[in-house]
Amino acid sequence: RQTRSCMCGLSQGSHSQSKEEKQTVNNLSAGDVRDSMPLFRSGCGGLSPTSALHLSINRCKVQRACKLNEVWHSRFPKIHWSNVVRNRDYVCFLAEYDDIAYASAIWSSPVAANRLKEGKTALELRRMAISDDAPKNTASRMIGIMRKIIKKEFPHITLLLSYQDTDVHEGTIYKASGWYPASKNKGTSWTNNSRQRNKEQSLSDKIRWEFRLRDSPIK
């Protein structure tokens, strides 16, 4: 399927998976990975949602979120689950209707946390990918609900951030969700003389959008 996606691009011990569960996710087809009950329906749900209000926003296993991102994200499909769980904080969400996923989101501690003043108390939307059959306004509704969940359940997080790929996006989703543009960063490679990284999926300029949850962590 052609899909809509954006650049975005919490440590949950209860979300750990066994080796068998991880292998099951890896072996699912693109259709099955959308379905919360693939063994019963093989990816065939009921009616499609006609409004974003019909979607329920739920946490999900990181492996499933990464698999859906691979299927849906047109710009940044590659993100391995091990690069998510090694962070101090991370959490993943799905937007579902009738147990079928229509969007996925992956949050973690910022990739450039050491360069940010609030790096230790910030959370970055690393990836957000939306299927082309998702209803209008899915992204803004999902971002709004995820923001409320994170603020309520993770009192040490003070700031949310995400990077917009300027080559393909105009930041409309962030503007509609009440975020503000904090800075514009020139696209650069993470590879340097001392460390070789995988080839970048994009080297375009990025705008960092932010949303403040609170002024200081709640202890």
Predicted features along the sequence, with ranges:
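Short, charge-rich patches within N-terminal targeting peptides
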Residues: 16-19
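A positional "C-terminalness" feature that preferentially activates on distal terminal regions of long
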Residues: 27-35
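Short amphipathic alpha-helix that is part of the acyltransferase structural core
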Residues: 35-83
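Conserved beta-hairpin
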Residues: 89-105
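Short hydrophobic/aromatic beta-strand or adjacent loop that forms the aromatic wall/cage
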Residues: 90, 204-208
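Flexible, glycine-/basic-rich loop-and-beta segments that form/coincide
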Residues: 216-219
